[in-house]
């Protein structure tokens, strides 16, 4: 019984050490991933979402694929749920 508990505890400590070592090596990975996601997202916003959220009225229309919201008076995506 004592031997199995000792081996289990040793295995858990070894697993913790291995996980900590791999995490410390890859510490910069999440930062790089997030920065690349936000960089790609900002490029997408400039190209595709140029009109989303712009102020509008019924005389001054929105870009293609967008409609002027009656409630908020800004450009929103056109869709089947819009009246």
Curated annotation (Swiss-Prot):
Superkingdom per UniProt: Eukaryota
Expressed in which tissues: Expressed by the venom gland.
Predominant place of localization: secreted
SUPFAM superfamilies, alphabetized: omega toxin-like
Key words, A-Z: Cleavage on pair of basic residues, Disulfide bond, Knottin, Lectin, Secreted, Signal, Toxin
One GO location term (cellular component): extracellular region
The organism of origin for this protein: Cyriopagopus schmidti (Chinese bird spider)
Function: Agglutinates erythrocytes.
Signal peptide: 1-21
Record's keyword annotation contains Signal: yes
Prosegment residue ranges: 22-49
Disulfide-linked positions: 51-63, 56-68, 62-75
Cited Pfam families: Toxin_12
One of the record's GO molecular function terms: carbohydrate binding
The organism's taxonomic lineage, starting at the top: Eukaryota, Metazoa, Ecdysozoa, Arthropoda, Chelicerata
Cellular localization per UniProt: Secreted
Domain notes: The presence of a 'disulfide through disulfide knot' structurally defines this protein as a knottin.
PROSITE patterns hit by this protein: HWTX_1
Name of the molecule in the record: U5-theraphotoxin-Hs1a 6
Family: Belongs to the neurotoxin 10 (Hwtx-1) family. 51 (Hntx-8) subfamily. Hntx-8 sub-subfamily.
């Amino acid at each position: 019984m004592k031997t199995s508990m000792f081996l289990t505890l040793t295995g858990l400590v070894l697993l913790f050490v291995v996980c900590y070592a791999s995490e410390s090596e890859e510490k910069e990975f999440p930062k790089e991933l997030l920065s690349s996601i936000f960089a790609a997202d900002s490029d997408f916003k400039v190209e595709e979402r140029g009109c989303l959220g712009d102020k509008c009225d019924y005389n001054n229309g929105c870009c293609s694929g967008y409609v002027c919201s009656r409630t908020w008076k800004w450009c929103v995506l056109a869709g089947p749920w819009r009246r």
